């Protein structure tokens, strides 16, 4: 019998937002997204101890590295180990995140992206199956532009505004991950409300606007809605190129009726009020981002949170080196 999850898959590529292998097998996800927070959670589970042990062994076999370089390589190798295992389960791609503390450094982002791809190659994984995740700062987008020209595909995350999305599209990145739930959180707090009806949810509307803008202007960059707070938000975005959904919401969709899902986003039926191409020059990008209180705040907050979880993971690994 069909359910809401199966129905959603008819219109949208469903991606599991998890580093838990059991979950990936259960829901038949096409791709998987990971981030420092998810890997930190998974790495605390004894069943993934072998992946940590392998990363430590890999680093200890290298000579001439400083303590800082050892730690950095161990984290990268651990992320790649998770990615390699995930790719044994999903038929598509895995997203692996660059250190959030590099979000304002073009060269460091490019270097880290290349290093992660080299580790995947060493493990026998083709770069076509990997997306390098970068924050949607000006520097992150510029780094993605360089990596994409080298054939390294990128997923621009922590994206909260049309200006960030437009800059990514002009940079010809493979995929963007506009966040829904964190936008919802911001406006719930600001307006002092308990929640929004899905069709009027500011986070949902943001993704709808980005999707329509990309399709109107013929951009090839895929839109993958991310960061959902309830199943209704995902249902309202049926038809989006991809949606990355957490395990608890995948379960809710699996248990919900298929009749709840109809195609909401359609590239052949776009609204009439889509803006012309935005000015994505450096100065205008910074101004537009600064002028959007929510996007400015949430981008910075998201970078800090990912950095915080990465430090926790580093502290865990440091004891083993």
From Swiss-Prot:
SUPFAM superfamilies: Aldolase (SSF51569). It catalyses: D-sedoheptulose 7-phosphate + D-glyceraldehyde 3-phosphate = D-erythrose 4-phosphate + beta-D-fructose 6-phosphate. The keyword Hydrolase does not apply. It comes from the Eukaryota. The keyword Calcium does not apply. The active site is at residue 133. This is Probable transaldolase. It comes from Dictyostelium discoideum (Social amoeba). The gene is tal.
């Amino acid at each position: 019998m069909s359910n809401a999850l199966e129905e959603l898959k008819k219109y949208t590529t469903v991606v599991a937002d998890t580093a838990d292998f059991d979950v990936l097998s259960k829901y038949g996800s096409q791709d998987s997204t990971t981030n420092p927070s998810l890997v930190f959670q998974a790495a605390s589970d004894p069943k993934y101890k072998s992946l940590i042990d392998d990363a430590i062994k890999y680093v200890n076999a290298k000579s001439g590295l400083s303590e800082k370089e050892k730690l950095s390589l161990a984290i990268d190798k651990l992320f790649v180990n998770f990615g390699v295992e995930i790719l044994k389960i999903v038929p598509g791609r895995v997203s692996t995140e660059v250190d959030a503390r590099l979000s304002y450094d073009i060269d460091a982002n490019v270097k880290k992206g290349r290093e992660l791809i080299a580790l995947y190659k060493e493990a026998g994984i083709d770069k076509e199956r990997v997306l390098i995740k970068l924050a949607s700062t000006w520097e992150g987008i510029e780094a993605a532009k360089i990596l994409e020209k080298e054939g390294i595909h990128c997923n621009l995350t922590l994206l909260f505004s049309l200006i960030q999305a437009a800059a990514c599209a002009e940079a010809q990145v493979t995929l963007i991950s506009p966040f829904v739930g964190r936008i919802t959180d911001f406006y719930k707090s600001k307006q002092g409300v308990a929640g929004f009806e899905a069709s009027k949810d500011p986070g949902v509307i943001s993704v709808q606007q980005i999707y329509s803008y990309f399709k109107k202007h013929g951009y090839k960059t895929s839109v993958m809605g991310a960061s959902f707070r309830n199943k209704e938000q995902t249902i309202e975005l049926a038809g989006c190129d991809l949606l990355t959904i957490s395990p608890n919401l995948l379960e809710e969709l699996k248990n919900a009726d298929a009749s709840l899902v109809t195609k909401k986003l359609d590239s052949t039926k776009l609204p009439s009020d889509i803006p012309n191409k935005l000015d994505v020059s450096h100065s205008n990008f910074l101004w537009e981002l600064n002028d959007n209180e929510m996007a400015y705040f949430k981008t910075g907050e998201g970078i800090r949170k990912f950095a915080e979880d990465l430090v926790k993971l580093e502290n865990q690994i440091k004891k083993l080196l």
